[in-house]
Regions:
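Phosphate-group recognition and catalysis centered on beta-loop-alpha active-site segments
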Residues: 3-243
Length: 243
């Protein structure tokens, strides 16, 4: 009898273990599931070629994320990917890096500088200056789609309402995206009509300045639970991630 009970106990534990694995699997799928209800609205964007940070060309003195780069992209009928930051005095500017060193050969950060101070800097040794986001929108004027990356160092969410205050009157096609899921969550809550995307890659191997848990959750798309992105943009080299 005791042997029979032991066997029954073993079989029961095995069943519980299998149920646990299945439940965890479906729970994970639920957590990483994007919003699929607007897939038809995403499709037109997938059919376009994109000028990453505008159609820049150092040999022609056209820096990345500059007005000439955006003019060239529009001229070639290319969709535009660009990046936005918030300055210390609340201006939304188009720039990729947090640091000013690589492009402007200057110390400091965009977030730590006023817009007037940034206008004294030049982009990649040219005569071009960091453009205002509103000026870029005014120029593009809906002629090509925009893919706008929210740059949110230190998870300062002030950029989100500032960007939305500019975007809410823009009539052209655009989507927003970010590595920071809190920024995507802000749009999910406050401007749900905006198409939004989660950027990700093998973040646990990079960006040590950010908390490991946050990088882990974004890498494995666990933060989709709080922001329900309409699309996921994953670094191609890291596409082996099981999520």
């Amino acid at each position: 009898d005791s042997e029979m009970w032991r066997e029954m106990g073993f079989e029961w534990r095995e069943r519980v273990r299998k149920v646990y694995v299945v439940v965890c699997f479906f729970l994970y799928l639920y957590m990483i599931m994007p919003n699929t209800s607007r897939r038809s609205k995403i499709l037109p964007y997938l059919k376009r070629d994109y000028a990453h940070r505008g159609l820049h060309d150092s040999s022609r003195l056209i820096p990345e994320n500059s007005m000439p780069a955006f003019r060239e992209a529009v001229k070639q009928n290319l969709a535009i990917e660009l990046d936005i930051h918030l300055t210390r005095d609340g201006k939304v500017v188009v720039f990729h890096d947090e640091s000013l060193k690589r492009i402007c050969n200057a110390e400091g950060t965009v977030e730590g500088s006023t817009f007037d101070a940034l206008q004294h800097l030049h982009l990649s040794g040219t005569s071009e200056h960091m453009p205002l986001f509103s000026d870029v929108l005014r120029y593009v004027n809906g002629r090509v789609p925009l893919l706008i990356e929210l740059k949110l160092p230190d998870s300062n969410m002030k950029l989100c309402p500032a960007a939305w205050d500019i975007l809410k009157d823009y009539k052209g096609p655009y989507m927003v995206q970010s590595f920071n899921s809190l920024g995507i969550r802000w749009f999910h809550k406050h401007a749900p009509q905006v198409l939004r995307g989660q950027l990700s890659s093998a973040l646990t191997r990079t960006n040590p300045e950010n908390p490991f848990l946050a990088r882990f959750c974004v890498q494995f798309l666990l933060t989709n639970l709080i922001c329900r992105p309409d699309f996921i943009s994953y670094k191609l080299a890291d596409a082996g991630n099981p999520s």
